[in-house]
C-alpha cells in the first residue's frame, strides 16, 4: 500500500468554510484535489450516496481505495483526521 495520503476537498464557490479548509491545508503544506460542486447536482448526489450529506465542505483523506470522509464542520475535525493518518503512517514504518 502506498504511503502517500491523498486529500480531496469537495467545495463550492462562495463557501467561506470551504475556503477556510483549503487555506488550512495550504498553510500546513498538504496538497489536495478540489472538486467544485457548484451547480453540479450529480456531484452532490455522490456525496449523498457516500456520506449521507449534500453540504460542503467534505474532506476525504486516504490511501489506495480506503478513504475517510470528514463531514463535520470545524477545523478541529480535519486536524484530528490528519493526525490520525500521520500516526498510521508512522506505525507502518
Curated annotation (Swiss-Prot):
The keyword Disulfide bond applies. Residues 1-93 form the Glutaredoxin domain. InterPro entries: Glutaredoxin, Grx-like_ET, Thioredoxin-like_sf. Pathway: Amino-acid metabolism. Its EC number is 1.8.4.-. It comes from the Bacteria. GO terms for molecular function: electron transfer activity; oxidoreductase activity. The keyword Transmembrane helix does not apply. Belongs to the glutaredoxin family. PANTHER family: GLUTAREDOXIN, GLUTAREDOXIN-LIKE PROTEIN NRDH. This is N-acetyl-S-hydroxy-L-cysteine reductase.
Amino acid at each position: 500500500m502506498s504511503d502517500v495520503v491523498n486529500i480531496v476537498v469537495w467545495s463550492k464557490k462562495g463557501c467561506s468554510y470551504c475556503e477556510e479548509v483549503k487555506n488550512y491545508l495550504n498553510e500546513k503544506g498538504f496538497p489536495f484535489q478540489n472538486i467544485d460542486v457548484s451547480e453540479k447536482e450529480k456531484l452532490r448526489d455522490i456525496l449523498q450516496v457516500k456520506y449521507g450529506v449534500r453540504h460542503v465542505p467534505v474532506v476525504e483523506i486516504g490511501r489506495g481505495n480506503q478513504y475517510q470522509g470528514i463531514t463535520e464542520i470545524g477545523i478541529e475535525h480535519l486536524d484530528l483526521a490528519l493526525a490520525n493518518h500521520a500516526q498510521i503512517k508512522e506505525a507502518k514504518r
